[in-house]
């Protein structure tokens, strides 16, 4: 039977698949819309499975809070273009809502949880891979709780390229908590305070700094003093409370929070794609890859 343009349009709207894929599916199923949808889903899922070896190093972070619970998550895509797609943004929001409401312990538990639409989180993501046409991955998330007497600070940089969720104790000042989150996004400290730095790491740095000072030919009687000074600078680079506050470098972060009788309880910072090695291919390698097939 002849397939009409209206049928193709309807199938595209229902599945998000390409025009030629829709026309082919309708032809193969003699114009049966439901069977065509099933066929495209089968092909879409197969297509999604074939994409599993791709590196998804773009994407976005998102933060949502509801009362005393908050969630920060990172979802990866293969291209920045898809990360700006409305369908991708809808997926990001839907996943955030689910994680916030259900608070799974880890990724494995999250992927197996049933959503309101009846599918598992994994099935929901896979169905969106078929529609969007790229590998999509829920990479990580953290669900954080606070007390009524504490404050959440949520900050997204560059539309979600970096996300930080902070918790301050001793204050309900959300503006201050957001300022701290903004600082963490900009400076990326590894620890809140010096007491979180292991003795092993501190001693290792001290040994390196000592050797540096001796190599510079400094007298041994002043090496120890120099090393402690440089070690303080090391702590300033990696510890949030010791850092100059980005909005007012004349003050340390610890002074800013202490002025409000507050303390930094915790923070989570996600930067899209950090730690993921993006595959770099040039034309010569592409030709070689084709030759080897």
UniProtKB/Swiss-Prot annotation:
It holds the Pfam family EF_TS. Keywords: Cytoplasm, Elongation factor, Protein biosynthesis. Residues 79-82 are annotated as: Involved in Mg(2+) ion dislocation from EF-Tu. GO terms for cellular component: cytoplasm. The keyword Protein biosynthesis applies. NCBIfam families: tsf (TIGR00116). This is Elongation factor Ts.
